[in-house]
Amino acid sequence: MSLSDHGRKLHICVDFLLPRISPNISVSLRSIEIDMLGHYYSYLDQMRHLTNDWLIIPGHDWPYFGGGVRAVDLIEHHDKRLDLLRGAAANGPITTAGAMHALFTFDLTDHELFFASCEARAHLNHLVARNEMQIQTEDGIEYFYPG
């Protein structure tokens, strides 16, 4: 959820349009199949039209101007992440764990591991929603194939 005041050109974005980092876009463990990244792309598509005179108030860091530019940066960031997964799946089917290794090339703490797995799955779900990947379950493990 975010709030906008068009008269004052003020947008309170909570964690969705942070100035320095990409927010964690994750699936819910209760609804693992939902395309959360698709929802986020829709939000960013709306925000990319903000002019530079809008004041953005995030839930972390400091207020800033340039929310439209930041939205485009975040779209490009997630596009690159999707490209990494397309490349990983080109060599054979990948699991959510395989997607995590493609997206996060550094050692993860236990806390980071949870968020990384949910974010990796959100990116895989988006590729499925775009019909760029298919899911096949074998022995209780979900594999993601190009297609």
Report each predicted region and the residues it spans.
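Metallo-beta-lactamase
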Residues: M1-L82
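C-terminal regulatory/interaction regions
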Residues: L84-G147
